[in-house]
């Protein structure tokens, strides 16, 4: 993306959210929590994000095991769901948080196809049990919105947020 001289840090925190938040509020809340858990020098720019999959307003996290992955993928069959990402950019005391939502439609797939996908191992560390950037793309019929959001980081939104901090990528 044109960013040089950076460090990747995975903050260790328990993602806790108040009940009753809308999907966009939920991912923004967790993104801000992650930002607060990362220490930085005053002039450093910290970027954090959190992506979640929502089906019928309910969060689909990462599958606990293969049976859970099959349950999630079966529930997504022939339907659409929402992928939300909260992005936070922080420099010193200044912090900006925004959300991006994308609608994703899954095609109908056979149980055998879903089990083969699960055996690949790809779904096991992904919210909603699929990765659109890999074999999971074969389950997706249509995307309405930012493709990169479904991957976990809406790059256009991030570039616009960085521009507000004086960082341009092009």
Placement of each model-derived feature along the sequence:
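Anionic-ligand binding patches
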Residues: 21-170
């Amino acid at each position: 993306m044109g960013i040089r001289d950076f460090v990747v840090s995975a903050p260790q925190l328990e993602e806790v959210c108040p009940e009753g938040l809308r999907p966009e509020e939920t991912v923004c809340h967790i993104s801000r929590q992650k930002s607060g858990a990362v220490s930085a020098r005053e002039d450093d720019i910290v970027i954090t994000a959190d992506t979640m999959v929502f089906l019928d307003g309910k969060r689909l996290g990462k599958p606990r095991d293969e049976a859970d992955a099959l349950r999630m993928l079966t529930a997504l069959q022939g339907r659409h769901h929402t992928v939300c990402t909260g992005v936070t950019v922080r420099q010193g005391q200044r912090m900006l948080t925004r959300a991006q939502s994308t609608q994703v439609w899954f095609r109908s797939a056979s149980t055998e196809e879903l089990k083969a996908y699960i055996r690949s191992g790809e779904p096991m560390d992904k919210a909603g049990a699929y990765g659109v950037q890999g074999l999971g793309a074969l389950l997706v019929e249509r995307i309405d919105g930012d493709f990169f959001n479904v991957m976990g980081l809406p790059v256009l939104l991030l570039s616009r947020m960085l521009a507000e901090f004086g960082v341009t990528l092009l």
